[in-house]
Structure formats: C-alpha cells, structure tokens
Amino acid sequence: MTRTIPGKPQLLAEVSDTSANTLELRSGEVTFEVEPEDDITAAQLGAVLRSTDGTASLSEISAKTGVAPDKLTTILLPAQIAGLLADRSTPEAESPMAVLSSVEHVVNKLLEELIFDGPFWRAILDHPEQVEPNVYYGFGLENWYFLSRESEFDSAILSYPSSDAIRTMANDFYHEEHRHDDIVVRAFEGLGISRQDLVSARPLSTTSALIKLLSWWARTDPLFFIATIGILEGRLEKAESEGAYYDSFLRAAAAAGIATHFVEPLRQHAKVNAGHDHGSVSREFFAALPPLPVGTEARLVGKAHLFVEAYAEFFNGILEYYGDPDRPLVRTIGTSPVTTTAGVENGRS
C-alpha cells in the first residue's frame, strides 16, 4: 500500500539528541532511536524532525533544511508507518453559498426545460379553462399525500451530525411544516372526500417515487436534500392588483372557475409558506454551514438532474391520471373509490 506523507506533517513525538549520531523520539511511554542514513547528516536529520511541527509544508521543510524532497519522504516514512505523523494542512474547501448557487443554476435551467415546458404546466399555463377539473383536484390531492408524508424526509435531518445550527434550524422548520396537511385537507370537504378517505388512499406512483427519493437523500446525502427544500416549497409571486400571494396554479384555478371552497384552503397554505419564507429555507441553511469539502459542488450538481426528473414526473403523472374524468379521484384500498364531486356542477363553480 502506498503511503503519502501529509502536506503539513506534525511529528507526534519529542525529539532529543542522545549522542553525536543518534536522536531519540519519545511518544508517551514509547521511545524510538533513529540514526541518519545514506548522505543525510545527524544535524540534517534533527533539523527535519524538529521542523516537522505542523506549520511548514514539505517544500518549506526542504528549503529550510537543505534536504531534497525525496529524501524527506525517506526520513519521514517510518514515522508515518508508526503513526507518529499528523496532517495539519488546511484542506481546500468550497463556499457553501457558492455550492448552492451552482446547484440552483442547474436546477432552475432543468425546471424550465423539464417542468414548466412539460405537459402539466403547459396545459395549466396556456389554457387553464380547458384542463379537466379533476386535474386541479388531483393536484391538490397529490400535494396532500406529499405533505402528509413529509415527516418521512424532513425528520431525517433533525439529527444533522456536524452542525448545531443546522439541527436547530431543521427543528424550527419541522415544527413550522407540521400539520400543514390539516390546512389542505379542507379543500376536499366540498368534494365529499374525508380525511379517512385520504388516509386509506394511495398516491400516484409518481408521487410515491418523489417521496421515497427525497427520503433516501435525506438519510444518505442530507446536504443535497436541504438544497431541494427551497424548490419544493416554491417561490410565490406577488399579485400587486390583489395584494396577496399566489402561485401559478392558484391563478390557473381561478381562471378555470374552480370552486372557491377548493381553492381557498390551498391559497391559505400558500400564504402560510410565504409568511415563513420557506422558499428561502435552503439558502438560510447553507448560509449557516462551515466551508464544505472540495468535491461537494460536483456531488450535489450531479444529483440535480434526477431530482428534477422525478419532480417533473410528479406533475406529469397528475395530468396523465386525473386528465381522464372517468377515473376515480381517490384510489382507495379495499373500498369503493370516490368518484363524485359532491354536487359541484362540471367540477367548476
């Protein structure tokens, strides 16, 4: 096995001269005697060992002692093998905010390509009045399934191992998000859908896939999961004429004439998120992080495409399934599916 001498080695032993040609290294109760070899003098050997204090690089030690770099390796390798060398070099690091900026740049580009130019959002944005009402209801339902299972991934970062600040922020975020599904569930009361119907129902496979993927990342790469939170929470836009916060879906639902009893709970949930500024959560988390190891940016950016693909399938799955008005709104297990809109004519107000 090849061994590499640390960039700024520190000798974990005291150096003393025992004779004109012998030095003694003492580490705890263990003592080593070392002698110069080849064309290295005892003075040079002593100078090298005493210069190995963690403050100088190998090139600096070489310049100071006059010992060639390859000879330094020969001298220090036995100490490295014996576990007497520590690395005091400062590792290269990446700025957390620069890392997040790179991830956001890639994700935003992919959002435009795969989501906002995808089937669901093109239908919603371009001709909302032609979209089946069940698609709007399905969007609300699948979001409820997502929210009601949010603890599967949010809870995983509560024990973030390397930062007290992140753990505190994660705990605050978790409490702010807790029971948001209670707000959204009210949207379905006018459709004849109860909480019990939802609890015993199955989300679409595309919704389940996104949930499981986020849960996996929250446990195996929490930093990447944290980078996705701002995207998942959504950045709401301000409608100046009405003085309230809306997102594209709520505007489309209004244009399509979807019943107020369905839209208002979703709007209320959007306002709660806007009030907590959850669209900026990822940036707040990353701003609290210490410098990150080199390679973090490449690792996180490398996962961005899969994330956006799964997110795009979440939306497109809604259009594909709920776009067929003959399919049940709620896919229950072992009971009759809910298929009516509880007296809402044509699904519109």
Describe the function of each predicted region.
Residues 123-132, 150-168, 251-256:
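Helix-loop segments that flank and shape redox-cofactor active sites
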Residues 140-150, 170-191, 233-240, 266-279, ...:
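Alpha-helical transition-metal enzyme core signature, strongest for iron centers
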